[in-house]
Amino acid sequence: MSSSKRKRGAETAAEDCDDGTDKSNTGNSFFDIYGPEAKAELDFKSPETTLNLQDVQGLVTWVLAEGFMPSWVFIKNKPLIPKVVLLYLPGLDAALYLSHSKTLSSLKSCCGNPMALLALSCVVDEMRTIDTILTCKGRKKKTVTSSVEPPPLVSSPEACNLMGKSFVELTKDIPFPVSYYTLSQKEMEQNGYTFEKLELTPTLPAPSGSCPPEIVALDCEMCITKEGLELTRVTLVDIQGQVLLDKLVMPTNPITDYNTRYSGITAVMMEGVTTTLKDIQEEFLKLVFKETILVGHSLENDLLSLKISHNLVIDTAVLYKHPHGRSYKTKLRILAKKFLAREIQESESGHDSAEDAKAAMDLALLKIKHGPDFGSPPEVIRKKLLAVLNESGKTTSIIDNINIVKRYASESSNAIPVSSDDEALSKAVKEVKNKRSQFVWTQFSELNAHFQSRADDPQKLNSRLAEMISLLTCNKKSGLKKSNVSPETKEILKKMNERVQSLYAALPTNAMFIVCTGHGDTSIVHRVRKMLKDEDEIGFDREKLVKVLEELQAQAEVALCFVGIKQ
């Protein structure tokens, strides 16, 4: 059967769902249509496809609500599916599953081979994974009372060239004052501008009677020394695009890596450079005063490398909001291409701080000229997945800890708080057998809680890190894949397997069973990141610990999704 015929057949079947029959008798009606031997089946179009969390949510809304047909799986006889059970297993990444697939045999026996699932970054809160699955997002519909259409995006370099004009000309008849776009104290704290905790030199008030520049853009480049990244180039440009300052700086410590790919700095360029950090600070403070608005992209890094504090900042990484929220920031190169039709950071010789500073200034001026809504992603509305399913006439149950139940249950959901995996299994089995419940969510969290407890125990943490460093040192190719698993972890995996089997056994025929692991052991990732940040805590070679972190993070971000239909 061709994919187009499959789609038409599925759509026809979906239309039959809305014929006004009683929802509780829908299954019997469809068995009358398809015959007593009919069964729902899955056809994975591309088993090698890597899914994301939205794909998992999309599968649920396609089966139970008015979602879109997934591109990665075809469901034969979809109307025969009486319910969907979604089980969340945090902590189980692909590597752990593959190394203990025999212990976790029920997953394959129930659902077949898993598909790779790209987890969210380990940097974000673990709750974001659940939020991504249990919260549906859509663009807000425009209404008659909506504000005026935002200006079109710039399509050519000439159209966006705001440089060459004075501050007065550029700020004439603007929607909001320039100060509106500077970071608030809270925003500075949220984005790493923690000046008060460090010994930094503050910018000073302008001398009486002087005319300090109203707004300037800053960009710095760094090379790597034994102490990490250190300042090697400072560039300031004014509102007209003129370079006010552009100097190379000799780091305090010897350079170990010129970081040319990103910094654009080479050994030849640094020959004969005698300007010190103190020298460049003095020059900087003669151009940037307390009243000056400083523009840049992720300026907290530049100011920290300069060891200067300044509280009047327009940060284009914050100014242009990322579609996925505050935890993400769009790269300057992408913003320049999208809003300025300008290619930057393309040279093989590395970044150009003057080019980057001008791009940041142009982006800030565009926002100032057109207003705060310019360049903002479409307004998104968030609805609970369970509410979306309820609106489609489906009855839902959520079985989880009290915080998750309170946060994601809809007004019509059967909300069941539990405090252990055994209790979650018991309640889930009951709901699965309830013919009126068409969607059931639950999670088994013992493995993830075990990882959290282990990461919080200094002795266990240090022992595990020592083992990992040893593995990396002895066999770089094998990475951490052969790391030993403790008897306690094995026992938890065994119990997880038994619970999965018990839950599956309770499913009615043709029920869809989705098992999503979400992420691996992020607890140890967060702990190691903190150790590297608080250098006094490190009891290992820093370079080796960084390599361990890279391995841990890469492993934790490859999760799995199992999908099966009870036969």
Curated annotation (Swiss-Prot):
* Leader peptide range in chain numbering: none
Report the top EC class in one word.
hydrolase
Q: Where does it mainly reside?
A: nucleus
Q: Kindly give the Gene3D superfamilies that the UniProt entry links to this protein.
A: Ribonuclease H-like superfamily/Ribonuclease H
Q: Where is the Exonuclease domain?
A: 215-364
A GO molecular-function annotation: exonuclease activity
Enzyme Commission code: 3.1.-.-
Q: Which SUPFAM superfamilies match?
A: Ribonuclease H-like (SSF53098)
SMART domains linked to this entry: EXOIII
> Looking at the keywords, is Chloroplast present?
no
Alphabetically list the UniProt keywords: Exonuclease, Hydrolase, Nuclease, Nucleus
Quote the cellular component terms of the Gene Ontology held in the record: nucleus
List, alphabetically, the InterPro entries matched. Answer: Exonuclease_RNaseT/DNA_pol3, REX1-like_exo, REXO1/3/4-like, RNaseH-like_sf, RNaseH_sf
Region entry Disordered, spans: 1-24
List localization entries.
Nucleus
- Name the Pfam families on file: RNase_T
Member of which family? Belongs to the REXO1/REXO3 family.
The UniProt function text for this chain reads: Probable 3'-5' exonuclease degrading single-stranded small RNAs.
Q: What is this protein called?
A: Small RNA degrading nuclease 5
* Organism per entry: Arabidopsis thaliana
Its lineage opens with: Eukaryota, Viridiplantae, Streptophyta, Embryophyta, Tracheophyta
The gene name on file is SDN5
